[in-house]
Amino acid sequence: MPLPQLDPAQYAAQLAEKAARLEELLAPFDAPAAEVFDSPREHYRLRAEFRLWREGGQRHYAMFEQGDKHKAILIDDFPIASRRINELMPQLKAAWQASEVLSFKLFQVEFLTTLSGDALITLAYHRPLDEAWQAEAEQLAADLGVSLVGRSKGKRIVIGRDYVEEQLVVAGRSFRYRQPEGAFTQPNGEVCQKMLNWAHEALGERDDDLLELYCGNGNFTLPLATRVRRVLATEISKTSVNAALANIEDNGLDNIELVRLSAEELTQALNEVRPFRRLAGIDLKSYSFGSVFVDPPRAGMDPDTCELTRRFERILYISCNPETLAQNIAQLADTHRIERCALFDQFPYTHHMEAGVLLVRR
């Protein structure tokens, strides 16, 4: 993880530059003015990863300048990370400095926290983990009030839970999420909550069904399910699928069907190219899809999946790469127009931005 340059005094100007860049990318499609959702200036990042660097006979948190993995910058605190992470950093460092068992061949530390205060720490080692390590790790987890995961080659030891529990409020309703260690979650919780509320409002109240591609742990699935008759959601990651199923059950939602298929495979299924055993018991023809929600990886949608979305009246698209978003919109522009668009500043002090668009059929 490279070291970001935090300068709150420059935040407004940097956000304006991002908004201008998004406007430039969407200008060929006659997009309306983007709604801009800012980030907290500090303590916004709910997860952080540090390498350990030996200096002066001790291990220290370290990060690196972009493009230089050999020049370590020692870290004592991390202002972009959540207050909970900043509380835990010195406590954990004191623990490994006091214990040869905890520090021996420890090379990486990961923190995962939530807006609701939950925390999980992952310790990664270049050695096998034994009973002595587990005993000290159990005491450490109790002392810090966290769950803890130890990782070494081919082995994982979980103390407490291997996930954190988050609560996000959308349109006045609180949704509970399990966010697993090692799986993708939105790093900026405050902005994530703004994204969920925007998507919920943009979709509107529908009397038909929603298809969701790339659903992850159900981050958007849960609130959007309250806006439609039924949801068919797809995800390829086994860890994310299991978390999504637990989240659906924890929130008492009974109108969501989740299948472990890639977007490309679902496209084949809907086009009746070939059957899939993982769709056994699901009658695709019983769905009346009026909308599709997509939150693809940085590469955007592949051309076939993009063509699939064309058949829907409404396309709600969250993008972590507006460059590929614009490419996908160009493919759809002859049949769909942009009704709403938004910029979500998930990653302050970087050039990265998250965008949302609602496309409706012309």
From Swiss-Prot:
SUPFAM superfamilies: S-adenosyl-L-methionine-dependent methyltransferases
Listed Gene3D superfamilies: 2.40.50.1070, Vaccinia Virus protein VP39
EC number: 2.1.1.-, 2.1.1.35
Reactions listed under catalytic activity: uridine(54) in tRNA + S-adenosyl-L-methionine = 5-methyluridine(54) in tRNA + S-adenosyl-L-homocysteine + H(+); uridine(341) in tmRNA + S-adenosyl-L-methionine = 5-methyluridine(341) in tmRNA + S-adenosyl-L-homocysteine + H(+)
Sample GO molecular function, one term: tRNA (uracil(54)-C5)-methyltransferase activity, S-adenosyl methionine-dependent
One Gene Ontology term from the biological process aspect of the record: tRNA methylation
Binding site for S-adenosyl-L-methionine: Q186, Y214, N219, E235, D295
Family classification: Belongs to the class I-like SAM-binding methyltransferase superfamily. RNA M5U methyltransferase family. TrmA subfamily.
Protein's UniProt name: tRNA/tmRNA (uracil-C(5))-methyltransferase
Gene name linked to the record: trmA
